[in-house]
């Protein structure tokens, strides 16, 4: 019998964690080394529509979904894909897989969660470094004296999130729905993809507010200028969320000391991976841009880069693993303390730091990129090649298989038993008396 592997993950959700979970689980199924059962869990309010019945690999996942409440047998290996404070260690060998951290320090609850497992897998060197460098003092509750340290005590391995280059690639194909959306965009544009999360002006995690502000200030009163397209949402894809995004954009526009400002568009709603690739490749999109304050990995930036168009993003956190500074535009800035309005208890902690882009320098680079687009074309193509050769889904699967063989415990393998051939024997003939 194959070893029993139990996986807990948001595998059905339309989320970054859902995408990551589906890729990892598909890889494990293809290895054919384990008897796999999967417990599907929610991821916030994201839709539970991540499994596509037209994709054979998703049907293989669906066949292994486990709907029972408990386990009758202890798993040989348990994998929990999620945030560390929720990790469960029900197996004989337990693996925690997390996208990691967007700031300079994780919570003590996360460190305790990491230490419940036998092994941790993260997608970037940034996440590994933060987990290994986060240390808390242990204090006696009675005397308040320091009695030790709380730090990660288990091995952490880096396995990048591979891009499916069969889907995310340079293409001239068109999607009817994407074409209809983009028909409203006037002229050339820069594209941002990501959530618009909580936080005051310039303080939300992806710094969408800062991006909109800088873009408007940079191109106000300019005769020739691009538009900015935001593929974004907040908590979900509801009408209320749509109105809130529109309101935020209008508020920022109201802070600009001119009525002559660039167009800001936003796309709100759930697009398939193929539709996202069509959006990245749309002829009006000239560059991909983000002012993100921190990424555990930054998967959308990797997928966008496969279009062959230049990517502009901060030079800090997870995405610098795959964005080569020779082929991308990495923005300068500095580490700043997380603002109270952006604190998310247990995830983005008060007192931790993340990256704030230097807006003045960014404005200069944005304008230079727009004016000198041709000069950056070859860099965009080289970045796409860099990802397809080094950060593809197939490459990730290869590295994951080697990691499983090397790091997972050796378990008994099923073998066919073949008995040796025995010489034929003749029984003695019995004679009647």
Task: Locate the predicted segments by residue.
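A charged, aromatic-enriched C-terminal amphipathic alpha-helix characteristic of glycosyltransferases
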Residues: 357-361, 371-402
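C-terminal alpha-helical cap of glycosyltransferases
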Residues: 393-430
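N-terminal pre-catalytic "stem/leader" segment of glycosyltransferase-like enzymes
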Residues: 1-74, 227, 401, 433
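Donor nucleotide-sugar binding/catalytic pocket of nucleotide-sugar-dependent glycosyltransferases
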Residues: 119-171
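Extended catalytic core of nucleotide-activated donor transferases of GT-like folds
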Residues: 6-8, 45-131
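Conserved catalytic-core segment of nucleotide-activated headgroup transferases in glycan assembly
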Residues: 20-22, 26-27, 35, 165-275
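Short hydrophobic beta-strand element within catalytic cores of glycosyltransferases
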Residues: 310-313, 329-330
């Amino acid at each position: 019998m194959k070893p029993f592997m139990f996986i807990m993950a948001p595998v059905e959700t339309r989320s970054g964690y859902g995408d990551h979970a589906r890729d990892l689980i598909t890889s494990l199924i293809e290895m054919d080394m384990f008897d796999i059962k999967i417990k599907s869990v929610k991821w916030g309010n994201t839709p539970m529509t991540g499994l596509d019945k037209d994709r054979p690999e998703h049907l293989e996942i669906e066949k292994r979904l486990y709907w029972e409440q408990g386990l009758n047998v202890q798993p040989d290996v348990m994998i929990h894909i999620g945030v560390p404070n929720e990790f469960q260690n029900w197996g004989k060998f337990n693996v925690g897989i997390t996208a990691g951290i967007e700031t300079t320090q994780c919570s003590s609850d996360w460190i305790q969660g990491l230490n419940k497992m036998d092994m941790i897998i993260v997608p970037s060197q940034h996440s590994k470094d933060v987990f290994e460098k986060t240390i808390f003092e242990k204090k006696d509750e009675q005397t308040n004296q320091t009695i030790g340290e709380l730090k990660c005590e288990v091995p952490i391995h880096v396995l990048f999130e591979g891009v499916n280059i069969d889907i995310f690639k340079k293409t001239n194909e068109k999607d009817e729905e994407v074409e209809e959306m983009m028909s409203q965009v006037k002229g050339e544009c820069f594209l941002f993809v990501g959530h618009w999360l909580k936080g005051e002006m310039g303080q939300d995690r992806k710094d969408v507010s800062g991006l909109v502000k800088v873009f408007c200030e940079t191109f106000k009163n300019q005769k020739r200028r691009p538009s900015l397209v935001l593929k974004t949402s907040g908590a979900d894809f509801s009408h209320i969320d749509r109105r809130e995004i529109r309101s935020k954009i209008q508020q920022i526009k109201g802070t600009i000391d001119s009525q002559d400002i660039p167009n800001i568009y936003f796309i709100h709603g759930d697009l398939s991976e193929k539709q996202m690739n069509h959006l990245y490749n749309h002829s009006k999109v000239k560059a991909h841009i983000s002012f993100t304050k921190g990424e555990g990995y930054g998967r959308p930036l990797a997928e966008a880069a496969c279009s062959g168009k230049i990517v502009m993003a901060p030079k800090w956190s997870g995405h610098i693993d795959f964005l080569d500074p020779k082929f991308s535009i990495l923005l300068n800035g500095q580490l700043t303390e997380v603002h109270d309005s952006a604190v998310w208890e247990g995830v983005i902690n008060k007192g931790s730091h993340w990256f704030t882009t230097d807006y003045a320098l960014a404005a200069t680079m944005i304008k230079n990129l727009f004016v000198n687009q041709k000069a950056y074309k070859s860099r965009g193509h080289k970045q796409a090649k860099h990802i397809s050769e080094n950060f593809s889904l197939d490459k990730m699967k290869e590295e994951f298989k080697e990691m499983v063989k090397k790091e997972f415990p050796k378990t008994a393998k099923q073998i066919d038993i073949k008995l040796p051939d025995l010489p034929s024997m003749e029984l003695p003939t019995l004679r009647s008396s």
